[in-house]
Amino acid sequence: MRKLQTAALGVEHNRHLLFEAVFEIIQSRMFEFLGRKKAKKSEPVIRARPDHCISRKNIDRDALRVLYRLDSLGYTAYLVGGGVRDLLLGRKPKDFDVGTSAMPNEVKHAFRNCFLIGRRFRLAHVRFGQKVIETATFRQNSQTVGEIIEHAAEGPFEDNTFGTPETDAYRRDFTVNGLFYNIRDFSVIDWVGGLKDLEKKVIRSIGDPMIRFREDPVRMMRAIKFASRLDFKIEKDTEKAIRKLHSMILSASAPRVCEEVFRLFPYGKSEAAFRMMWEYGLMGDLLPELSEFIKRDGGRKSRVWKYLAMLDRYETAMAKQNYEVMNGLRAAVLYAAWALSEPGRNREIMGTMLSSLKIPKATYFLSVLMLDSVKRLSQPPERSRRRFIYNRDFPDALDFNRIVVRAEGRSEKVLDQWQNLYNEETSKET
C-alpha cells in the first residue's frame, strides 16, 4: 500500500512539474509574439575566412558535396551545430550536419541517395555508404499554444515550423552550438553570441535557461556533457537554473535520459561529468541508490571518482570496441565502489541501475559479468578457472579488472598471468 501511495505522489509531482513547464513555455511564446513588432531586426556577427580557423580540408568530403549541391541549386546551405563548434576549437567533429532553406522534398529531389525520416518534422538523411549527412530545413519555434499542450507530455517540444537561419539559431540549446559555416563565402555566422562564449570557454543557454530547461530537461545533462568534454564552465544563470530545476529530469523520456548518461563517458571526461552531476543534484535524481551509498560515507565518493578517473585513461584506447560492451564496462566502473565493498550483491546492486535508469538488459548483464569477474581474476589461473578465457567477454573483463587494480594501486601480477594464458590460447587457434 505504501508503495502505491509513493508512486501516486510521484505521478502527481511529475504532473505538477509538467503543468508548470507548459505554463512557462506558453508564457514565453506570448512574450515572444507580443514583442516581435517592437523588436528591431537583429544582425549576426559575421567572421570572414581570414579571421577564423575553419578550413574545407577539415570538413567531411561528403558534407561538402551536400553543401555545394544545395548552394548550386540556389538554396541557402550552412554547416551547423557541433561540427562548426569543434572545427573552431581545432577538434575533429564526430558529425557534420547541414541546415538549409530547401524543403525536405526539395532535398530529396536534389539527391538520389536521400531518405526522409520523421513524422512531425521531416529530416533528410543523405547517405554515402554507411555514412549519413543529416540535412534539416531551418526551423523556428511554433506559436501554436494548442500544439504545446497537446505534445508536452511526449518529451521536448518539437519545433515543427519551418523558419530562417536566424530563427533556427535561436531555437538551439547553447550558444556554442548555434554557429553556422557558410559554404558560399567560407564565413562563420553567429546570431547568438557563440563566438564570444567559445573564446571565454563558457556553456550558456540560448534564451532564458529556466524556460529552455523546462521545455526539455535533458538540456541540463547536455550542458554538463559539453562543459566536461570541452573543459568549459557553465555560465552562472545556466548553472542556477540546473540547480533549481534538476528534479525535472525525472519527467523526461527514460530512453533519452539513459542515452545521455552514457554519453557522459566517452572522450575521457566521465569523472568531471559525474562530479557535476553530483554537485547539481542530477545524480541523486537519476541514480538514487548509488547516491545514498555515497552519502553514507564521504570517503566512498572519492573512490567513485577514482575509478572513473582510471576509466578515463582507458577510454581512448577502447574507443573502437563494441558500444554495447563498453557501456556494460562503464556501468560496472561507475558502481564498482559500491559493488566491491559489498561482495555477493552484484546483481542486486546493478539491478538498482536497471530499475532507476532503465538501462538495456544487455548492459545490465555485462556489468554484472564484469563485477563477478573480480573474484575469479584476483586468483592465479588454475585449471578449474581457466575456462573463463574462452568467454567472448574475457578481454573486456580483463580491462575492467586492470582499471580496478590500477585505481586501487595494487599489483597487476595475477592479471598478467591471465593475460599470458589468454595470449597463449589464442595463438594456438591461429
Segments (PLM) and residue ranges:
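Catalytic cores of the polymerase beta-like nucleotidyltransferase superfamily
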Residues: 2-9, 14-430
